[in-house]
Amino acid sequence: MSLSQQAILFIDRDGTLVEEPPIDKQLDTLAKLVFEPMVMPVLTQLQNAGFRLVMVSNQDGLGTDSFPQVDFDLPHNKMMDIFASQGIVFDDVLICPHFPEDNCTCRKPNLGLVKDYLQQGKIDFTRSFVIGDRETDIQLAQNMGIVGIRYDRDAKDWPAIAKQLLASSRIAEVVRKTSETDIHVKVDLDSQAKSTIETGIGFFDHMLDQIATHGGFELNLRVDGDLHIDDHHSVEDTALALGEALKKALGDKRGIGRFGFALPMDECRAECILDISNRPHLKFEAEFSRDTVGEMATEMVPHFFYSIAQAMGLSLHLSTSEGNAHHQVESLFKVFGRALRQAIQKNGEALPSSKGTL
């Protein structure tokens, strides 16, 4: 996710945020203004979790004699004032005033209302949703390439929607293809299912499994690299793809520990201190007793951690003592996994930064 991409909820108005008047389907008086149950606390909860709110509504014939603008404005403005009084802010209110027979490009499920969001790259497609009570809302979501959620006061109310959105697994998938490597990586930070790792380098597979096991997440990784030359591109590009996937899965980083520290001791004394700060840096201290372990060059170990720090935005301090080269390298991957486990663990929705962003 780039800095400009955001998790956005595109929310229908009538029948979703407020009750749709059952007789004439027009919210044109204050007497008809009735909020859907629990919409206020749930929108507050979702907003605090980092979701941006955008209202998207079809209003048939708005501005015509059948639905004068002044009749629309009074209850609509009161609704917006009430939302604002509870700290609920909509970044945009997007309204199509046309009838279906006008064949406009902005009426849902057409994309006219949300065109700027799509063209300007504002949407994080993995964490954005359309919420509405009609099939046209679900069709809009499909046309946008995001997930649609069908609101229903009885079958799928606002608390149920909140549960679905806030419990969404932190999953990310990255495909990286270059002239040297073809990599497919998928991570699930909230699953501890058995990982599947195939890089073509047995010892490297074992090390990556240490990160996933001690990091407490599921990793599925396949690498097809130019191993007939050497291990450089496969190790480097794996680190870049894995770092990108981890960063993507963390989303806006709300609720994470951010910092990690681990100091396990076996034959080798390894130490890792890390900060998911989006300010990449590596300080690495190790003197390996051999040039290779298995089919992996030990000179690629610091390069792996440098690359993953760059891709994930880590400030990373990593060291190990003298010892058997296999145990030295393994201690580094283990200690990194243990520190990462602390840093990515989620507890609440607060952003762990006084700057308001990470």
Swiss-Prot record:
Residues annotated as binding Mg(2+): D12, D14, D133
Names of the cofactor(s): Mg(2+); Zn(2+)
EC number of the protein: 3.1.3.15, 4.2.1.19
Known pathway: Amino-acid biosynthesis; L-histidine biosynthesis; L-histidine from 5-phospho-alpha-D-ribose 1-diphosphate: step 6/9; Amino-acid biosynthesis; L-histidine biosynthesis; L-histidine from 5-phospho-alpha-D-ribose 1-diphosphate: step 8/9
Keywords assigned by UniProt, alphabetized: Amino-acid biosynthesis, Cytoplasm, Histidine biosynthesis, Hydrolase, Lyase, Magnesium, Metal-binding, Multifunctional enzyme, Zinc
InterPro entries: HAD-like_sf (IPR036412), HAD-SF_hydro_IIIA (IPR006549), HAD_sf (IPR023214), His_synth_bifunc_HisB (IPR020566), HisB_N (IPR005954), Histidinol-phos (IPR006543), IGPD_sf (IPR038494), ImidazoleglycerolP_deHydtase (IPR000807)
CDD domains, per database record: HAD_HisB-N (cd07503), IGPD (cd07914)
Protein name: Histidine biosynthesis bifunctional protein HisB
Organism annotation: Pseudoalteromonas atlantica (strain T6c / ATCC BAA-1087)
Gene that encodes the chain: hisB
